[in-house]
Amino acid sequence: MFYPVIKKALFQLDPERAHELTFQQLRRITNTPFEFLVRQSVPTKPVTCMGLSFKNPLGLAAGLDKDGECIDALGAMGFGFIEVGTVTPRPQSGNDKPRLFRVVEAEGLINRMGFNNKGVDYLVENVKKTRFGGVLGINIGKNKDTPVEQGKDDYLICMDKVYPHAGYIAINISSPNTPGLRSLQYGEALDDLLLAIKNKQTELKEKHQKYVPVAVKIAPDLSEEELIQIADSLVRYNIDGVIATNTTLDRKLIQGLNHCGQTGGLSGRPLQTSSTEIIRRLSQELAGRLPIIGVGGIDSLVAAREKMDAGASLVQIYSGFIFHGPRLIKDIVTHI
């Protein structure tokens, strides 16, 4: 109800400053009785996916709460699951500012944040405090100064630390803002990473006496051949799920608009069709062998349904949440 007024004020500010102010307020109320200020009632729409029970199929995508500082406040808004991160083994400041831009006319965002986060240990301490009743995903990545050839070591370090506290673990190999990261999506590099992750998952399952599923997050900028190869690798290594998709480098839908020339990943409405098409192609290729979490430009009930009709078992929002606020959660969960 109040979001259009709040949004108008926030959109007068630099996007990253607006984000910081919003999270400052959410941090104040998270894990306190004042969570009622953001709480909204949504119906239960149970879904089982990756062996986990979700109270509804709508989640918050990674990138909004990178350090897990506002899990309970965000959870009070009605999300069935929340994905925190991307987090790296060591804290890092990310790329130089400005690094976040609104393409308001297209309801899009361009970011080149560069995995800015306070490190995996800080995130784990926050996760330990949460009372969120939904499924918590933890999205992990590599530090910028870790050579790509040693990148898998960063993922294994993070897995070790987050495994006891995660509902599922998301492997981010598709951000366009960490040099060389997307090369891990292909060929031998992907197979090498998936084998190491699967072995680590088996080791941690024995150690902690619980199985935590692993999902891999992929880019939308994939050729048919690359998509087929990725699907084949995910199945061969018994990965539990795939998150499709991350942001795009394609700018054809925002040509001529403000900030269209900024480097970074584009999200929001301009990503909607291409991410849905990747989900559709992936679904055909996987033939039900592992579930898809659909993300990319969901800004309405119709857009969420399109992702699910294309083959997604669960969906996530991020940019749509920025542009439309908590009401979008209620609309999607109520009518999906």
From Swiss-Prot:
Flavoprotein as UniProt keyword: yes
Similarity comment text for this entry: Belongs to the dihydroorotate dehydrogenase family. Type 2 subfamily.
Reactions catalysed, as given in the entry: (S)-dihydroorotate + a quinone = orotate + a quinol
Residues that coordinate or bind FMN: A62, G63, L64, D65, K66, T86, N139, N172, K217, T245, G268, G297, Y318, S319
EC number: 1.3.5.2
Name of the protein: Dihydroorotate dehydrogenase (quinone)
The protein's role, per its UniProt record: Catalyzes the conversion of dihydroorotate to orotate with quinone as electron acceptor.
Cofactor binding note: Binds 1 FMN per subunit.
Pfam families in UniProt: DHO_dh
GO BP term, pick one: 'de novo' UMP biosynthetic process
GO cellular component, one term: plasma membrane
Keyword entries, A-Z: Cell membrane, Flavoprotein, FMN, Membrane, Oxidoreductase, Pyrimidine biosynthesis
Top-rank taxon: Bacteria
Membrane topology qualifier: Peripheral membrane protein
GO molecular function: dihydroorotate dehydrogenase (quinone) activity
Cross-referenced Gene3D superfamilies: Aldolase class I
Cofactor requirements of the protein: FMN
PANTHER family noted in UniProt: DIHYDROOROTATE DEHYDROGENASE (QUINONE), MITOCHONDRIAL (PTHR48109:SF4), DIHYDROOROTATE DEHYDROGENASE (QUINONE), MITOCHONDRIAL-RELATED (PTHR48109)
Entries under InterPro entries matching the protein: Aldolase_TIM, DHO_dehydrogenase, Dihydroorotate_DH_1_2, Dihydroorotate_DH_2, Dihydroorotate_DH_cat, Dihydroorotate_DH_CS
Catalytic center residues: S175
Gene name, Swiss-Prot/TrEMBL: pyrD
Recorded metabolic or biological pathway in which this protein acts: Pyrimidine metabolism; UMP biosynthesis via de novo pathway; orotate from (S)-dihydroorotate (quinone route): step 1/1
Protein species of origin: Pectobacterium atrosepticum (strain SCRI 1043 / ATCC BAA-672)
Chain residues that bind substrate: K66, N111, R112, M113, G114, F115, N172, N177, N246, T247
Annotated transmembrane regions: none
Subunit structure: Monomer.
Stretches of the chain forming a coiled coil according to its record: none
